[in-house]
Amino acid sequence: MAAAAVAARRLSFRSGLVLLQTTRGTGVCEPKVCCRFYAGTESLPKVEGSDITGIEEIVIPKKKTWDKVAVLQALASTVNRDPTAAPYVFHDDPYLIPTSALESRSFLLAKKSGETAAKFIINSYPKYFQKDIAEPHIPCLMPEYFEPQIEDVSEAALEERIRLRKVRASVDMFDQLLQAGTTVSLETTNSLLDLLCYYGDQEPPADYPFQQTEHLENLEEAAEENNQTSKMESGPWKAQNNAERIFALMPEKNARSYCTMIRGMVKHRAYAQALNVYTELLNNRLSADVYTFNALIEAKTFILNEKFEEKWNDILDLLKHMVAQKVKPNLQTFNTILKGLRKCYSLGRIPALQILREMKHIGIEPSLATYHHIIHLFYPRDLSAIKMPSLIIYDIMNELEGRTFSPQDLDDGRFFQLAMSVCSSLRDLELAYQVHRLLNTGDNRKLVGHDPLRKVYYSKFFSLICSLEQIDVTLKWYKDLIPSVFLPHYQIFIGLLQALDVANRLELVPQIWKDSKEYSHTFRDALREEVLMLMARDKHPPELQVAFADCAADIKSTYEDQSARQPAFDWPANPLQYIAVLFLRGGRSQEAWKMLELFKKHKKIPRNELLEEFMDTAKASGSTALAIEVVKLASAFSLPIGESLAQRVVMDFTVDPEQKEALGNLTELNSSDGESSSDSDSDDK
C-alpha cells in the first residue's frame, strides 16, 4: 500500500523529468494532496486509479553559467574608489608610494622587473613549479616551455617551432625539409609565412634581457653582416628576406598566402611592395579578406608625394574592389580611412563626415577611436589661430552621453585625452564635465589610456576647473583627484594658487606649499616665487602673517639647501624681497635684518617698498641704530630713496649729534654718486 501511495504521488512531465510531490495532511494514514496549480481552489481529493487532469506544465529554467570572477565583480561593484588611498598598482606603503612622475615610472619599472625576474626563474626551473594553486587557473603563473621537444626533421617539428615562435629555427627546419625532398603542406607553409611576416623575418624580442644569450649573439652577428645593407634601406622590411624567398618557392599559393605577405609588408612599412603583391593576387583571380584591405588602405594613405585627390581616389578604388569581391568592411576599415584622412588636414573633413554617415548606414557602430580621428581633423593643436572653431565636438558628446564602450581599436585610449584638450582650448567647463561623465560611465574609465595620456587628461581637466570653477568646488576636486588618480605637475599647483588668489582664500597657501613638497616640487623656482608673491603682496591679520612667515622660513631653507649643493647658486632678487617682507610682518625682525646681508652678499638691490618696511619696523621698535643701517644700505646701493630715508630718521627718531653727522655724510655721498652717474650719462650722450 505504501509503495502504491508513493507511486501515485509521482507526476510525469513532458520534459522527461519526474518530480516527487511531497504531501502534508492532518494524519499519517490520510495524506492530503495539495495542488498549487489553481489559485483559490480547494484541494482535490485523492482518487485511486484516476488520472489527475488540469495540471499546468512546469518549465525548468535553463542553467545560467556564471563567470568565474562574478562574485568578485559583484563585491567590487559595492565599493567606491577611495580618494585618500594610493593607486592600486603601487604598494600601500609610505616609502613605496611615488611622489612624482619620475618616481612613478621608476616604481612601475621596478615592479615589472621583479615580475620578469620571477617569470624567468619559473621558466628556467619548471620542475619546481608544477603545483597549480590558483583557482580559477591562471596560465601565466605556470611555467612556459620554450625549447622544442621534437628533434627529427619532420613537418611536425616545423609546426612545433612555429608554435614556439622560433623564427630562425623554423626557417632552418623548412630548408632541411626541402633539401630532404619532403613536401611541406600549404597550411604549414602559410603558418610559417604568418610567423615571418609578423616579426619581419626577425627573432621576437626577448621577454627577459638576461635570457636567451645565444639568441642575442646570433642577432649581433646578423647585425654585423647586414650593417651596410640596413643603412641603405629606409624600413625594417628587408628585400629578399626569408618571407619573400619562401613565398617565391611555394609551388601553390592561395589567398591566405598573398594576404599574409601584404599585411606583413604593410606592418613593416614596405607599402609599395604590398601593393605589388595585391596586383599579383588580382592577376591570379583571388580575393582578399577585410584585414588585407585594411592594410592596403593604410598603405595608400602612407605613400609619400601624392596629392589628396590621388590618395582619396585610391581609397575609393579599394572600397570598390571590396564591393566587387563581396568583402564587407568592418570597424577597422573605416577607422583606417579616417586615420589616413588626418594627414590631409582640413581637406579631409568632408570625406570624414561622409565616412561616418556610411558607417551608420551599414550598421557599424563607431568606436571611440572613430570620434578621436574626427575630433583630430576638426580641431588642430593651435585653436587660437582659428576665429570660429567647429562645434562638432558638442554633437559628438551629445551622441555619446550615457553610453559605455569596450576596447575595439588601438586608438580608443586616445579619445578622452584629445577631447579634454579641446575642452581646455575652448575654455568650456560644462563640456569638460560632460566628457568626464562619459569617462565615469560604466567601465569607460579603462579607456582613458596609458599613464602619460591619463596624466594629460586629468591635468587639463583640473586646470580648467581651477580657472573657471568656484573655489569650494575646486578644492573638492583637488581632494578627490590628488594623489589617488594622478600626481600633479608643479604648474597644477600654480593654477590652484591663482584660483585661491581670485577667490581671496590666501590662508590656504601654506597648506598648498606643504602639499607641493610632498610631490617633489620643492626646488621649482616658479612655484616658490608664486607662493612668496601671493603671501607678500598684501598685508593680512597678524595670525595669518605668522603662518606666512613660517612658510617663508621653510621656503628660505630650500634656497639654502640648494645653495649648499650648488656653490655657484645665485639667489633671485624677488624671493629675497618677499621673504624679508614676510619676516618683518610676521614678527621675525632679526631674521629679516639678516636677509639684508644676503642682498649685499648676492649683489641684489632691494626695492624701495622693502626699505620702507624696514624703516617702519625700526620706528615700531624705537631703534635709531637700525634705522641708520637702512640708510646705509640704501647709500651702499646708491638708491635715490636714501635721502628721503635719512630725513625720515631725523624727523621720526631721536638722533644724537654723532648719528646726525653720519647721516649727513651718507646723504652727501649718495648725492655725489648720483651727480657722477648723471655726468657720466651726459658724457656718453
Curated annotation (Swiss-Prot):
Instruction: Give compartment(s).
Output: Mitochondrion
Q: List S-S links within the chain.
A: none
Stated name of the protein? Small ribosomal subunit protein mS39
Q: Which organism is it from?
A: Mus musculus
Kindly give the PROSITE patterns that the UniProt entry links to this protein: PPR
Give the transit peptide, as a residue range: 1-10
A GO cellular component term found in this entry reads:
plasma membrane
Task: Cite the record's Acidic residues compositional bias ranges.
Answer: 676-685
The family note in this entry says: Belongs to the mitochondrion-specific ribosomal protein mS39 family.
Report the record's Gene Ontology biological process terms.
mitochondrial translation; regulation of translation
What are the alphabetically sorted keywords of the record? Acetylation, Mitochondrion, Repeat, Ribonucleoprotein, Ribosomal protein, RNA-binding, rRNA-binding, Transit peptide, Translation regulation
**Sites bearing N6-acetyllysine, chain numbering:** K127
The source's domain of life comes to: Eukaryota
Q: Name one GO molecular function term.
A: ribosomal small subunit binding
- Subunit note: Component of the mitochondrial ribosome small subunit (28S) which comprises a 12S rRNA and about 30 distinct proteins. Associated with the 12S mitochondrial rRNA (12S mt-rRNA).
Please give the InterPro entries that the UniProt record associates with this protein: Pentatricopeptide_rpt (IPR002885), PTCD3 (IPR037387), Rib_mS39_PPR (IPR055063), TPR-like_helical_dom_sf (IPR011990)
Q: Is rRNA-binding found in the keyword set?
A: yes
